[in-house]
């Protein structure tokens, strides 16, 4: 009623992220799954990614934010209830996250946004020592045929516009801001993320893609633990 609907358009289902298979959810029926900083609290993180992949339609997406560490967290810190409750000691090592995501079937994980977490509390800082943490918003697509590296097939896209909130510039990830009406060269993986998903109606493709030109230049993922430009963003305190 508050949003002007005559009948409810939302269904709430109680369950556990690690046990989505126990819920009455149809495999391959979801266009989009969203999660906000809760996967790090799950004890069986690979199960979460496997279940999400199973539930998504081909071309579907897991869009989520979470906290990651620049190394594997020692077992004694994982057991610390304060650190765990602060979403720190349950954080996946960044390299393990990428391996877990790809093992679940999500090729070429993308970073949408990231910022380092500044540990300001003296007691927490003493416990974590030199471990660095980052808050990352990521997107994972359920797509067949994504390659291990970004490959150049001489193709580009033109953004037509029309995505709500991104009328002038479409942000796929931290490395791809696509201006409306401009020819934008893309690698094969990025092309698939645009043309084999719900975004396809908003793009035109330039090039047949029948010739390989080697690695696509400048398509490396960002260092999520690197210092950020303080003029434009800031680290989140803990």
Regions found by a protein language model. Name each.
Residues 1-9:
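Short, conserved SAM-binding/catalytic segment
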Residues 7, 19-33:
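A short acidic, Gly/Pro-enriched loop at the edge of an enzyme's catalytic core
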Residues 18, 31-44:
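A short SAM/SAH-binding and catalytic strip from SAM-dependent methyltransferases
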Residues 46-61:
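A short glycine-rich, Lys/Arg-flanked "PGG" loop and its adjoining helix->strand segment in the class I
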Residues 68-88:
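Short, glycine-/aromatic-enriched active-site segment of Class I SAM-dependent methyltransferases
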Residues 89-111:
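Short alpha-helix
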Residues 104-238:
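C-terminal lobe and adjacent flexible extensions of AdoMet/dcAdoMet transferase-like proteins
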């Amino acid at each position: 009623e508050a949003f002007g609907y005559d009948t409810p358009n939302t269904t709430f289902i109680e369950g556990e992220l690690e046990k989505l298979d126990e819920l009455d959810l149809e495999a391959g029926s979801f266009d989009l799954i969203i999660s906000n900083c809760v996967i790090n609290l799950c004890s069986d993180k690979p199960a979460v990614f496997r279940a999400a992949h199973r539930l998504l339609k081909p071309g579907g997406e897991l869009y989520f934010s979470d906290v990651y560490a620049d190394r594997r967290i020692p077992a004694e810190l994982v057991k610390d209830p304060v650190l765990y409750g602060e979403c720190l000691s349950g954080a996946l090592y960044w390299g393990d996250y990428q391996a877990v995501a790809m093992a679940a079937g999500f090729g070429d994980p993308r970073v949408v946004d990231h910022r380092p977490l500044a540990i300001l509390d003296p007691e927490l800082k003493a416990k974590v020592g030199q471990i660095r943490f980052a808050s990352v918003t990521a997107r994972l697509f359920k797509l067949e045929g994504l390659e291990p590296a970004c490959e150049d097939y001489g193709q580009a896209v033109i953004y037509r516009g029309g995505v709500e909130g991104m009328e002038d510039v479409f942000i796929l990830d931290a490395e791809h801001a696509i201006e409306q009406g401009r020819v934008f060269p893309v690698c094969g993986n990025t092309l698939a993320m645009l043309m084999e998903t719900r975004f396809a109606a908003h793009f035109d493709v330039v090039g047949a893609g029948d010739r390989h030109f080697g690695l696509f230049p400048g398509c490396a993922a960002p260092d999520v633990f690197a210092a950020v430009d303080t003029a434009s963003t800031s680290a989140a305190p803990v």
